[in-house]
Amino acid sequence: MPIKYQLKESNGPVFVLIHGMGSASNAWKPLLPELENYGSILLLDLPGHGGNPLDPEIKMDPASMANAIANLINQLDLPPVHLIGNSLGGWIALELAAAKPDLISSVTGLAPAGLWLTPFLHRIPGTDLSKRMAKASSGIAPTALKSLAARRLGFSRISPHWEEMDYQTLLDAVTAMSESDGYYPAWDATLNRRFDSMISDRIPTTIVFGDSDFVLPSRTCQERSLAPTHAKWIVLEKVGHAPMWDEPSKVVKIINETVSLVK
C-alpha cells in the first residue's frame, strides 16, 4: 500500500485529510483539536512524504494518488468519507470524488492545486525555493525558527500570520519539506495536467482560498470555471496557502457546513 495512514476512530463520520506537496500529515495538527469532536480522522502521508518511503515505481500524478487512496478506503472498509485536502491534496481530493463517487460524501478543498487554465509544462525556476531552503537549513531550524528573521524568510509567502504561528507547526513544516523525497516526483507528475474532471452534484463540494495566497495566486491558479458547477467558493480574508493554519476554527465550520449538505 503506497499510502501511509493513521486512523483515529470516534463516533460520527470519517474525515480523510490529504496534505500538500512537500508537507506531511502533521500539517493538520492545528485543525485536529476541533475536528476530532465531530468524527473519526484518517490522516494520510503520500509516498515520499511524512516518513513514507518513496517507491520509484509508484505513479505520483493526482489521479493515481486518488486511486491509491480509494484502495485504502476500501481496504479499511470505511463508509463514504468526507475529504479534506490542501494544495496538491485538494487536487487529489477532487480527483477522488470524480473517479469514485460511491466512496465520497463531501469534499472540502483548501487552496487546491490544479485549477489553472494553462497547465505548467516544466518546473518554473525559483519556485522550489522553499524546498531548497528547508533542505539547507534543516540542521539549524530548531534554533533559527525562534527568530523573526527566519520565520519571515521561510513563511511570509505561506501565511500572513507568520509572526504569531505556533513554533512546532513551523518546525514540523520545515522538517517535512526537507525530508520529502516525493517533492519533485509529485511536482513533475502535475506537469501538463490540470483538474478538469466532473464531480457529481450529489457530492457537496467547497473550495476555499485565502486572499493572501501567494503560492497559488488568484490571477493564474484559481480558475472557478474548472471547479464543479455546484461547488461553493469561499475566499477567506487574511489567510494564506494553508487555511487550516491561519483560521482553523473557520475551516472546521466550513467543513461541517459542507457535511451538512449531504442528502
What are these regions (language model features)?
Residues 1-17, 36-40, 67-80, 229, ...:
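Alpha/beta-hydrolase fold catalytic core
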Residues 3, 29-30, 42-88, 120, ...:
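Active-site loop/oxyanion-hole signature of alpha/beta-hydrolase fold enzymes
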Residues 7-54:
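Conserved HGGG/HGGXW glycine-rich cap/lid loop of the alpha/beta-hydrolase fold
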Residues 90-101, 107:
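Short glycine-enriched nucleophile-adjacent loop
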Residues 98, 107-138:
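Flexible "cap/lid" loop of the alpha/beta hydrolase fold
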Residues 142-199:
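Conserved alpha/beta-hydrolase catalytic His-Asp/Glu region
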Residues 179-226:
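Conserved serine/cysteine hydrolase catalytic core
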Residues 239-252:
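Catalytic histidine-centered segment of alpha/beta-hydrolase-like enzymes
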